[in-house]
Amino acid sequence: MKEKIHPNYQEVEVKCVCGNTFKTGSTKKEIKVEICSNCHPFYTGAQRQIEVGGRAEKFRKKYGLK
């Protein structure tokens, strides 16, 4: 490898909008994220359950058919 051509890899702090912070390695000076594992619905269990029917189900519901 050539010397002095590679970016400096350092430990940085990742900051989420929810206030959670953690450390990781990066070539950037700081990292800001909008969502992390602390506030993501998949990890928190606060997922919304959506019942989605197909087009046929929508038609049946609209016209009162079985």
Swiss-Prot record:
The entry's keywords: Metal-binding, Ribonucleoprotein, Ribosomal protein, RNA-binding, rRNA-binding, Zinc
Molecular functions per Gene Ontology: metal ion binding; rRNA binding; structural constituent of ribosome
Extract the SUPFAM superfamilies matched here: L28p-like
One GO BP annotation is:
translation
Instruction: Name the source's superkingdom.
Output: Bacteria
Q: Which family does it belong to?
A: Belongs to the bacterial ribosomal protein bL31 family. Type A subfamily.
Q: Name one Pfam family in it.
A: Ribosomal_L31
Q: Which cofactor does it need?
A: Zn(2+)
NCBIfam families in the record, alphabetically? L31 (TIGR00105), PRK00019.1 (NF000612)
Chain positions recorded as Zn(2+) binding sites: C16, C18, C36, C39
User: What quaternary arrangement does the UniProt entry report?
Assistant: Part of the 50S ribosomal subunit.
InterPro entries xref list: Ribosomal_bL28/bL31-like_sf (IPR034704), Ribosomal_bL31 (IPR002150), Ribosomal_bL31_A (IPR027491), Ribosomal_bL31_sf (IPR042105)
List the PROSITE patterns hit by this protein, alphabetically. Answer: RIBOSOMAL_L31 (PS01143)
Record GO cellular component, one term: ribosome
What name appears for this protein in its UniProt entry? Large ribosomal subunit protein bL31
Q: How is the cofactor bound?
A: Binds 1 zinc ion per subunit.
Keyword Ribonucleoprotein included in the entry's annotation: yes
What gene name is given for the protein in this entry? rpmE
Recorded hits in HAMAP family, A to Z, give: Ribosomal_bL31_1
What this protein is reported to do is described as: Binds the 23S rRNA.
Q: Does the keyword Translocase apply?
A: no
